[in-house]
Amino acid sequence: MMVVRVQAALMRLGYYTGDIDGSLGPQTRVAIKAYQKAQGLSQTGRMDIQTLSRLGISIP
């Protein structure tokens, strides 16, 4: 579910153009890294706390 939220947020912001399928695959990781770079974050491709926070996604 978290991956779906991240994909949707990245799509709204123009970083992700793939299917919102909940899979943390290569295309999703590339989009995360691009977003992290634009935000001045470490480019890990992971859904870390800082990245989620910048995307406005709260962790349950």
Where are each of the predicted segments found?
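A short amphipathic alpha-helical interaction element
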Residues: 1-44, 54-55
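Alpha-helical interaction/regulatory segments in DNA maintenance proteins
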Residues: 46-60
